[in-house]
């Protein structure tokens, strides 16, 4: 059993709940508290050598992942004028605590919305991990390249910071009606992640997701969605692109350090009441393909890149309870 990484995909799916600038919202308190439970199921797709291709499913199970995140947000009105485009500006200060079976990670974030369709965000997090029944939360690749060696919890830390800008638009802002909400959201994020005490180009693992190295990276997502006044409140498609900036982030120059991972995920969001919402994603993703066959991902950083391998990656669910 191996936990894998739920990247920001689920968080993006749930941020739809805030993507309603065209609607009237009554602010009762500047505080907002929520708990989000994430779960992902990964079927098995064996690796296939060669140029760009699709890898079919070869098994029912490859891994599971789960985590719980508590969040507290304080909203400060920052109106820039009396015009309706300017008078709703806000500054959000958020603290989070993420807990998984193999890690714990607090985070701080700041978000400024100067205009209804523009959002700027930045933040950072620091966490640590441990081994639980063979599930490695934080580890370094062994010298022989065949296993990961556990790192000491609270002796080594995973550190990440990010800065991003988001453009969002809802046709309901200009066309009134319950059924007029076609939505678009695009985000570009610059981020850095590292393990303290680990040298650059050294391969490491965090939350059972391996083949990582320290470095500056970028993440983009594009959401196209339609909102409805139903329990099934939103359907759409999420497209994500992620890569390292540095072409020499990995020691092996043939691994293609700046490979762009692409994910395309149909999504649905259910809003059951003012407290409970559920996002569901079915993710198709790309990963590196190599010139030679291999069985395990731990072998990959020593191989030669040859193209894209597309596969069905996971089904992910995220339940949010807002107090």
Positions of predicted regions on the chain:
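Outer-membrane beta-barrel initiation region
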Residues: 23-83, 215-217
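Transmembrane beta-strand segments that form the barrel wall of outer-membrane beta-barrel proteins
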Residues: 35-41, 55-56, 88-101, 105-108, ...
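Transmembrane beta-strands of outer-membrane beta-barrel pores
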Residues: 39-45, 74-78, 97-101, 114, ...
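Repeated loop/turn-to-beta-strand initiation elements of outer-membrane beta-barrel proteins
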Residues: 79-84, 116-120, 173-184, 229-237, ...
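Extracellular/periplasm-exposed beta-strand and loop segments of Gram-negative cell-envelope proteins
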Residues: 95-98, 133-141, 145-162, 193-202, ...
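Hydrophobic, aromatic-enriched interface-forming segments
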Residues: 159-229
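Outer-membrane beta-barrel "beta-signal"
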Residues: 161-164, 168, 306-323
